[in-house]
Regions:
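Exposed alpha-helical structural elements
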Residues: 137-140, 166-169, 173-176, 246, ...
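Short amphipathic alpha-helical segments that mediate assembly, nucleic-acid/protein binding
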Residues: 16, 20, 28, 118, ...
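Amphipathic, charge-rich alpha-helical segments that serve as recognition/docking helices
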Residues: 240-278
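Boundary detector for helix-to-coil junctions that initiate low-complexity/charged tails
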Residues: 1-30
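Short alpha-helix boundary/capping and kink motifs at helix termini
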Residues: 35, 42-43, 48-49, 143-213
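Extended, charge-rich helix/loop segments that form flexible
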Residues: 104-164
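A short, basic-hydrophobic beta/loop patch
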Residues: 23-29, 33-40, 47-86, 92-95, ...
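Extended hydrophobic/Leu-rich segments
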Residues: 1-7, 25, 36, 43, ...
Length: 278
């Protein structure tokens, strides 16, 4: 069993190192993609070979997403989405990886998940609602101003809140997003600009067939939960090794067939309200 832990403060990577790792990941994934040509037979042979390696996370997510495209998107009730997975992790006290880079994973994920309702974003939105969206009166706004004045600014969505304009902009975008989702719901990723923060809401399926939220899209998920939306679009981007092997054995499927079967099972399991669940 792999040991998976969150990074300690002194182990966290700089932004530059994260960018370098991301570019290397994209290059490797592109080479594999071109080699496979997304032929079903080659695809299953490649995935089988990766499954036989002793690694905790494997097969680049972009390979799977390029093959299945929109087939990985389902609609779920956000009431079921209660846990976040961390992004940068340490495996067996040596390898530092980003969980979002890989479509399959192994090991125990309990130590790398956290409650969405205890997240800063969730608390920010409750705080905003308590002051009727008058963000300059909110506790978090005042806290970020105080940190700015002490030369210890907060970073939100890859932006440093080191000026009043930056802090105001963050809260104004948050409120605009809240109002948009309240009016239109959560839109699919292909309905807006291809920006990093507008990627589809990614979810993972653990060894028990339960869903967790992948890093990113925190504001959209929190807003949808607090607004009690009935459904939101999400994209399956990580599946536990034990669960897909269980589905393969149960239904006598190859890897590609098992992925689509899991998509179907997750849609059936998580699209209805909990009160209607049998």
């Amino acid at each position: 069993m792999f040991e998976i832990n969150r990074l300690r403060k002194n182990e966290r990577l700089s932004y530059r190192k994260k960018v370098i790792r991301y570019l290397i990941y994209k290059l490797k994934a592109r080479v594999i993609f071109l080699f496979l040509k997304i032929n079903s037979k080659l695809f299953n042979l490649y995935v089988k070979k990766e499954f036989n390696k002793r690694v905790c996370f494997f097969v680049p997510t972009t390979i799977i997403c390029s093959k299945f495209k929109k087939d990985l998107t389902i609609y779920i009730n956000p009431e079921y989405l209660n846990l976040n997975l961390k992004d940068w992790l340490k495996v067996d006290e040596k390898s530092i990886i980003n969980i979002s880079y890989y479509f399959f994973g192994d090991g125990n994920w309990e130590n790398i998940s956290s409650d969405i309702s205890k997240s800063i974003v969730y608390k920010e939105l409750l705080d905003l609602k308590n002051v009727n969206m008058d963000y300059k009166s909110s506790k978090h706004y005042l806290s970020y101003v105080q940190k700015m004045n002490k030369n210890n600014p907060t970073t939100k969505q890859h932006k440093i809140l080191n000026t009043y304009e930056a802090i105001d902009s963050y809260f104004e975008r948050f409120i605009n997003l809240y109002n948009s989702i309240k009016e239109k719901g959560v839109l699919k990723a292909d309905n807006f600009k291809k920006e990093k923060e507008n990627k589809a809401i990614g979810i993972a399926v653990n060894s028990n067939g339960e869903i967790l939220k992948l890093p990113g899209a925190q504001h959209r998920v929190v807003i949808s939960k607090i607004l009690n939306l009935e459904k939101i679009p999400v994209e399956i981007r990580l599946i536990h090794k034990e669960y897909i092997e269980k589905i393969m054995n149960l239904y006598n499927l190859n890897y590609d067939g098992a992925i689509l079967k899991i998509v179907y099972l997750m849609q059936e399991k998580y699209q209805v309200e909990k009160s209607d669940k049998r």
